[in-house]
Regions:
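Glycine-rich phosphate- or other oxyanion-binding loops that anchor nucleotides, phosphorylated ligands
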Residues: 1-80, 88-95, 105-110, 119-155
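Charged catalytic carboxylate motif
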Residues: 100
Length: 155
């Protein structure tokens, strides 16, 4: 699936990575306070970020495969051996991560067809997701949603 394709693309770039983990999303842009950072660590969170939700849920609803590749910029403020988060340092790491991400995406595109799974439940999750009865769906609504739900709205 998509995660395996991402992993293969990352390996081609020799980027250190960790597969799996718990992601905490916070509204941003902002940096965590020490109290927030400590709370997230008490939850055993691996990464704290400002994206991924609601994107992951919306992608699933549109039968779009979604994988998160989080490229870390800092340790947040909890780490005793690192200084507090500094915007300039974050930007420097972010720019380096952007280069890595572009190369990873090129590799992902090149090898993606090897990872397509016809049995992936993402292919048909809309079959059981639409609550509105077919006779209650207006043509205007079907036209509006045809790009993301046309397959099931034709039924």
């Amino acid at each position: 699936g998509l995660m395996n394709a991402c992993e293969e693309a990352i390996k081609k770039e020799n980027i250190p990575y960790q597969k799996g983990g718990t992601y905490v999303v916070m509204e941003g842009p902002q940096f965590s306070t020490l109290a927030e950072s400590s709370l997230y660590r008490s939850w055993k969170a691996d990464v704290i970020g400002m994206t991924n939700m609601p994107e992951a849920k919306l992608a699933r609803e549109a039968e779009i495969r979604y994988a998160s590749v989080s490229m870390v910029t800092d340790y947040d403020c909890w780490h005793p051996d690192h200084e507090n988060v500094d915007v300039q340092q974050v930007i420097k790491v972010l720019l380096g991560n952007a280069v890595k991400a572009k190369n990873m995406i090129k590799n992902l595109i090149d090898g993606f067809e090897n990872h397509i799974d016809p049995k992936d439940p993402t292919n048909n999750c809309l079959d059981v997701a639409i609550i509105t009865a077919p006779e209650k769906r207006t043509q205007k609504t079907k036209d509006k949603l045809k790009t993301v739900a046309g397959r099931v709205l034709k039924k």
